[in-house]
């Protein structure tokens, strides 16, 4: 009786969620993997705690008035003024939080924030922070993009026609500014037009929600401008051509990482709207080039917010490494490509960034983030970019990367549910026949080396459940009700059968200690376990005399011994004693997960990930990555007090 009630409730939740979302009748392409419905996924365990902390401590606790005031006053002028982006970044994350865990409080904040923003519109419909004479300059169009993204996010939650009308008016302003015969969008704002051009994404979303062809025509016009000469670029931006040619990202028209990927997010949406292959081929090619040239073991690497051929430079001192805005946007681009292609490599990349670079940037209090994250040194809280608003770009972008997690953790493919993430969770899905299917994932992945999925549905039904087999898991043990199923790393294991309530899927992962060698061959190594990078932390492993070399077995894996007391000591998720040979004798060095290494966010709390071999233990933390290389500020910045 209890389960029947749960199944009915699941259907009602899914129906209600779909009813609230406007139908998109103008999409030419259907996603190969569709995100779970709003509210259908609940993540538990450590990851769920982090998501909940972010919602409570940051997204629901913001002073909305601070975000709205710059729109009311319209005083921004120059290139150092980007308050125009803050409301939209915060609001898009809030809307995802409201979809994930809807409450009266979140709905009330969402409604008020949208209402008050729309009320700031100029007579022509412009929602921004500048007077007419300063529009299209600096970061203005970039900010208009974020306002439009936020307004459309509210419309997707409510279906309110007044909200859509405000979005249309904002779109019309953009057409008046950059449409045919108007200013070339390549000449607008900063970085050779990259930030302004990223308005492509909400313009396509506006077309999909209105069916009004003028917005699609405008989107095509924006892309066409990329191939026309501009005042700053004789050959134009050439984003699509350079991506398809495999050009390294650092050699594009402007190497600004975050803004570049934002343009390609827009191309993903344009592919959905048109079905034109090049609009997908280009983002796929860019992502592959980023994988080849810019990724680090903890995620998406940058220096000073730009691409710099970072893969081969990650083991040394990097000036202002791995901006959190870049990490979040790289995750969002991978999420788009996962939806459109169904290729599990994008889910692998989402997991890598989630458990390492992204969570590593989040402060333990949950309301603040690092601006830059290195692979050694200290954790430095982001500085406040604009004191009147009291925040920074990265503090607001971190939640955007985190809040997409429920949408890609469980998805729906052509033949049934798809499981991408094995953190403890419950997902209320739908079978191909429309029946409610509840998937419960138990265990403590990735601390545990296994997870169990329990299937619940009212009537037995034949369909497929697909499970991501991570590329890093060389030996994966998959069983259905005790029966072994062969799998291959880096693919989906599609299990087609008649499913019934109580069926159990058990999956064991290869959590041996992997030794990764420095990409540039400089002799350094890093230790990984599953999707998690491990780091030394000076609260667990003290500097002392000795020369250490990691000990490996005949298969070149390191021996890891779980050390829960060490993890508890520094409030880390996990800790392991790793066997090294120190001055010819076996000893252990204690590592913790990278995301919690340095989590005191203090100048005294030093960590290190890449390790020279042999490692001089006396100088293990003398790495040269000072806090000054991890901050835009000229003084140490603490997490602001509430």
Annotate each predicted stretch with a short phrase.
Residues 219, 283, 348-356, 361-451, ...:
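C-terminal beta-rich recognition modules with glycine/proline-rich loops and embedded aromatic residues
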Residues 178-183, 188-239, 243-251, 256:
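Solenoidal tandem-repeat scaffolds enriched in leucines and small polar residues
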Residues 475-482:
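Short, surface-exposed beta-strand/strand-loop-strand elements in extracellular ectodomains
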Residues 21-104, 108, 137-157, 196-214, ...:
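Aromatic (Trp/Tyr) and acidic
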Residues 90, 104-140, 165, 294-302:
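Helix-terminus loop motifs that line ligand-binding clefts
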Residues 132-141, 148, 164-194, 200:
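Asp-box/WD-like beta-propeller blade repeats and closely related beta-sheet repeat scaffolds
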């Amino acid at each position: 009786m209890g389960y029947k009630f749960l199944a009915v409730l699941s259907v009602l939740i899914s129906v209600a969620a779909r009813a609230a979302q406007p139908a998109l009748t103008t999409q030419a392409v259907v996603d190969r993997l569709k995100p779970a419905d709003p509210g259908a996924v609940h993540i538990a365990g450590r990851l769920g705690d982090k998501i909940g902390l972010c919602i409570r401590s940051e997204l629901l606790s913001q002073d909305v008035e601070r975000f709205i005031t710059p729109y009311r006053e319209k005083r921004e002028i120059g290139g150092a003024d980007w308050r125009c982006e803050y409301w939209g970044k915060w609001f898009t994350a809030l809307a995802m939080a409201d979809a994930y865990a809807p409450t009266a409080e979140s709905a009330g904040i969402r409604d008020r924030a949208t209402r008050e923003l729309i009320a700031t519109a100029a007579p022509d419909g412009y929602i921004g922070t500048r007077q007419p004479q300063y529009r299209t300059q600096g970061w203005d169009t970039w900010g208009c993009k974020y306002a439009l993204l936020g307004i459309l996010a509210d419309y997707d939650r409510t279906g309110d026609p007044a909200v859509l009308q405000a979005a249309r008016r904002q779109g019309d302003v953009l057409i008046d500014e950059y449409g045919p015969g108007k200013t070339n969008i390549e000449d607008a704002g900063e970085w050779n037009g990259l930030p302004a051009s990223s308005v492509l994404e909400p313009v396509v979303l506006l077309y999909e929600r209105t069916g009004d062809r003028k917005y699609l025509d405008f989107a095509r016009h924006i892309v066409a401008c990329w191939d026309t000469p501009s005042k700053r670029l004789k050959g134009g931006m050439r984003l699509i051509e350079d991506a398809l040619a495999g050009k390294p990202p650092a050699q594009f028209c402007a190497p600004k990482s975050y803004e570049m990927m934002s343009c390609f997010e827009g191309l993903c949406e344009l592919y959905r709207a048109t079905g034109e292959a090049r609009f997908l081929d280009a983002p796929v090619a860019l992502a592959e080039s980023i994988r080849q040239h810019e990724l680090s073991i903890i995620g998406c690497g940058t220096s000073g917010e730009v691409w710099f051929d970072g893969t081969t430079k990650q083991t040394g001192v990097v000036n202002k490494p791995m901006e959190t805005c870049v990490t979040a946007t790289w995750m969002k681009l991978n999420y788009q490509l996962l939806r459109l292609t169904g290729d599990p490599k994008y889910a692998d990349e989402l997991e890598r960034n989630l458990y390492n670079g992204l969570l590593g940037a989040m402060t333990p209090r949950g309301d603040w983030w690092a601006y830059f994250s290195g692979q050694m040194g200290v954790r430095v809280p982001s500085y406040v970019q604009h004191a009147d608003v009291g925040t920074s770009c990265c503090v607001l972008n971190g939640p955007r990367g985190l809040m997409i997690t429920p949408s890609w953790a469980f998805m729906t493919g052509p033949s049934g549910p798809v499981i991408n993430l094995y953190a403890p969770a419950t997902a209320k899905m739908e079978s191909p026949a429309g029946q409610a299917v509840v998937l419960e994932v138990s265990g403590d992945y990735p601390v545990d080396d296994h997870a169990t999925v329990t299937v619940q549905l009212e009537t037995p039904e034949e369909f497929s459940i697909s499970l991501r087999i991570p590329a890093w898991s060389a030996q994966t043990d998959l069983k259905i009700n005790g029966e072994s199923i062969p799998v291959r790393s880096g693919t989906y294991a599609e299990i087609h059968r008649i499913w019934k309530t109580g069926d159990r899927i058990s999956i064991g992962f290869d959590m041996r200690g992997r030794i990764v060698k420095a990409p540039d061959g400089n002799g350094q190594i890093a230790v990984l376990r599953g999707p998690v990078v491990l780091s030394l932390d000076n609260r667990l492993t003290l500097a002392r005399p000795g020369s250490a070399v990691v000990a490996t077995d005949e298969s070149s894996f390191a021996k890891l011994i779980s050390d829960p007391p060490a993890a508890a000591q520094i409030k880390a998720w996990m800790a392991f004693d790793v066997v090294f040979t120190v001055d010819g004798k076996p000893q252990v060095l204690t590592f913790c997960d990278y995301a919690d290494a340095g989590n005191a966010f203090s100048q005294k709390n030093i960590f290190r990930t890449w390790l020279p071999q042999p490692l001089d233990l006396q100088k293990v933390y003398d790495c040269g990555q000072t806090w000054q290389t991890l901050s835009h500020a000229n003084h140490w910045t603490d997490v602001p007090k509430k």
